Amino acid sequence: MSASQGNVFTRGLSRISRRKKKTKSIQNSLVSEQQPSFDAAIVPMPIPNDKSSIFSKGMDRLRRSLRLPKKRRDRSHDRHLSPDVTGGSKTEQWQPDEGAVRTGTCCFNVKYLGSVEVYESRGMQVCEGALKSLKASRRKPVKAVLYVSGDGLRVVDQGNSRGLLVDQTIEKVSFCAPDRQTDKGFAYICRDGASRRWMCHGFLATKETGERLSHAVGCAFSICLEKKKRRDEETAQVNVQSAQESTSSTPPKDIFHPNWEDNTSEGTSTQNPSNSRSNLAYQSFRKHVSIEDRYLDPQSVIINEVPASNHMDEIRRISKPRPTGNPALFLRQGSLRAPPDMPSSSDQFKRNMSLRTVSNNPTERSPEKKSFGTQLYNEPIYEGDEDPLGLGITPPVVTKTSGSLSNNGLDGINLNWKSIPAPVHQMQQHNANGDFVAAWPQNTIEKPTVGPLDKLQKQFEDIKLISISSGENTPTTRSKADEWLDDVLRVSMSMSPTSPSSDPPSTSSYSVLPKSGPPPAHAPPPLPVRQAVSNGSPSIYQQQLQQANSTRNSPAGINWNSSPNPMKISQPPAKPVDPFDVQWSRLAVNNTH
């Protein structure tokens, strides 16, 4: 057992010793073959003994920690080859940026400060002032990535949103410059497409300098200019080719009247293979443009062709008149669709007379009906009795003729009637005897005599002639009592038994008291207190009531044909009539009709 066990231990120890010998030989070979280089910083350490294996393991870990990672080793290699070390210029350092801009892969990590409106399209002072104002604002900068290409500038948010902050075409950019106060600052001025204002966008580069960003944008300017020149040249060439093709095309008569039996066109097509692809669809893209340019800007590859024109198009051009609106739509149309035979629709609708037919001739107009409502002119309201006896007799409507245009107090009174006042003592004598009919004045034909009323008539006729010739109306002021007396006078004249109201006789012995003028030949009888008027002028009706004190009946109520003695007819005594009741009853009757 002991021998076998000893053999086991001895074999194990020998194996361990062999391994240690191999590791020592490997380390010695590495140290001998190792040469100095910039890739790894190796610290020369003394070779540990066999007894210090733990120390050797710790040193190996230290060596591994001192070695630079691969990315840092690449950057250190670039640092050794940088222009600052080698003495090269900045343009050589930024030379790869131009190729990256052409391929559309140039990008920089920046902090987007925002945009502010400026009032000039170029200038370093303008950009520096905009950057200063953006830094002074309390807006938090946004971490973003600036992509620079020949088409435009794009700013993409680097946060969670990954949204597009700015998408600016390079044609709209007018100026760009770095900030001379800070190395990381950069700004460019562009025209805003929506508001048409000059806006300045500010950036702060995180890893690069503002000069490098400005150089990349300058490369984008040059690439855009080259594309524009190339596009203009190709467009000019295409225009020349299209003009040549239009001149060498077949005449119009051959187009409208083709000869299908002629095979000359087939021979020409076989001789010139280029004519077989005369369709413009095959020539719509430029053949010499590279795939990269087509991928970056596919719209610029398409040729803007001018349509070919021939003289037949000029023949077909017909000038069309300028469209005009219907003039009837601009005419003001009334609400009434009246027949064409009417004079005008506006005459049928007037203020306060929408349901009346009013003629244009002022001489044929009927007098307007008096009402208690609002009137167009300030006229006194009639408050007297139109039918004082309650017999249903209305005063006749007197129409004005062309000769009586002036408004005076004697309008409607026939001044041709000759008036002789009846003596009062005779009337009283007949009344005492009971013969009331004899006391009533009778019509007698007398010779024309010149009395005070005739003089008054001549005076008023002269006034009318003067007013008609001068075209002015004599202003008269009439009181309510005067109007009431005139109306009572017309009623009493219409109640005359011997003279009808429609055609009054030329002469009459009926006494007429005018509204104004000289007094009559004799004084009138005294008036009762309850029938006296405020102005003190008596009426005809009051004189008749004084004459018939016994019966108080009106002569118009006597039946002249049936009874010779009117005193035998019993009539109820006349009751006083309220003028307001008469007016309201008349309005009610008119409304029912």
From Swiss-Prot:
Modified residues (Phosphoserine): S17, S65
Stretches assigned to coiled coil: none
Gene3D superfamilies the UniProt entry points to: Pleckstrin-homology domain (PH domain)/Phosphotyrosine-binding domain (PTB)
MF annotations from Gene Ontology: ATPase binding; protein domain specific binding; protein kinase C binding; transmembrane receptor protein tyrosine kinase adaptor activity
One Gene Ontology cellular component: cell cortex
Tissue-specificity statement: Expressed in cells comprising the intestine, pharyngeal cells, the anal sphincter and depressor muscles.
Database matches in SUPFAM superfamilies: PH domain-like (SSF50729)
Effect of S17A: Has no effect on efficiently routing num-1 to the cell periphery
Effect seen on changing S65Q: Promotes accumulation of num-1 in the cytoplasm
The PID domain, residue ranges: 102-255
Membrane-topology descriptor: Peripheral membrane protein
Region Disordered, residue ranges: 1-97, 235-278, 331-375, 493-581
Quaternary context: Interacts with pkc-3.
Domains: entry comment: The PID domain (phosphotyrosine interaction domain) of isoform a and isoform c is capable of binding residues 212-224 of pkc-3.
Function: Involved in the tethering and targeting of pkc-3 to modulate the intracellular distribution of the kinase. The complex formed with pkc-3 complexes are likely to be involved in assembly, maintenance, and/or regulation of protein complexes that execute asymmetric and/or polarized cell functions.
Name of the molecule in the record: Numb-related protein 1
Taxonomic source organism: Caenorhabditis elegans
